[in-house]
């Protein structure tokens, strides 16, 4: 069961010219994630890390991913806004009647944790671009560049 009231995901304005995907982390705290979708991109995605703890494991992972993606690839993408659900504990929905609330979002991160390794983060984007990223798909490029310890 959730320890507090179930927060309602909402879009938040972002002054960054690269809108970011905002998400709610059940039982933890709101967080901000950036995702790529097709389109022209006029500048660096680094502004999307505003407000994110630069020392966090998630922040470090995003920086490694962007270093591992060829610059040409990044220049052909734009960031877009959306709402997703991060499930820190997959057993939370069982018996909680939150299944329908969770299923309405195009992106759901299961077994997400604020502790431990974010290197296994799997991103499933089914809205707008149908772009699918997995840690496996990027691992070769990241390892080639020596970005993963």
Swiss-Prot record:
InterPro entries: Beta-gal_alpha2-3_sialyltrans (IPR051757), GT29-like_sf (IPR038578). GO terms for biological process: ganglioside biosynthetic process via lactosylceramide; protein glycosylation; sialylation. Gene3D superfamilies: Glycosyl transferase family 29. One of its GO terms (molecular function) is beta-galactoside (CMP) alpha-2,3-sialyltransferase activity. It comes from the Eukaryota. One of its GO terms (cellular component) is membrane. PANTHER family: ALPHA-2,3-SIALYLTRANSFERASE ST3GAL I ISOFORM X1, RIKEN CDNA 6430550D23 GENE. This is Uncharacterized protein C20orf173. It comes from Homo sapiens (Human).
């Amino acid at each position: 069961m959730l320890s507090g009231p179930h927060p309602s995901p909402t879009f938040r304005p972002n002054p960054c010219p690269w809108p970011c995907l905002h998400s709610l982390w059940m039982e933890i705290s709101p967080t901000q994630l950036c995702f790529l979708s097709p389109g022209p991109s006029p500048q660096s995605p680094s502004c999307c890390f505003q407000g994110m703890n630069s020392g966090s494991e998630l922040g470090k992972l995003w920086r490694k991913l962007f270093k591992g993606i060829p610059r040409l690839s990044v220049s052909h993408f734009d960031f877009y806004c959306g709402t997703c659900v991060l499930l820190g504990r997959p057993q939370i929905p069982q018996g909680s009647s939150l299944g329908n609330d969770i299923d309405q979002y195009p992106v759901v991160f299961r077994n997400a944790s604020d502790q431990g390794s974010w290197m296994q983060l799997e991103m499933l984007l089914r809205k707008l671009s149908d772009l699918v990223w997995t840690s496996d798909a990027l691992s070769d490029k990241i390892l080639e560049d020596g970005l993963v310890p």
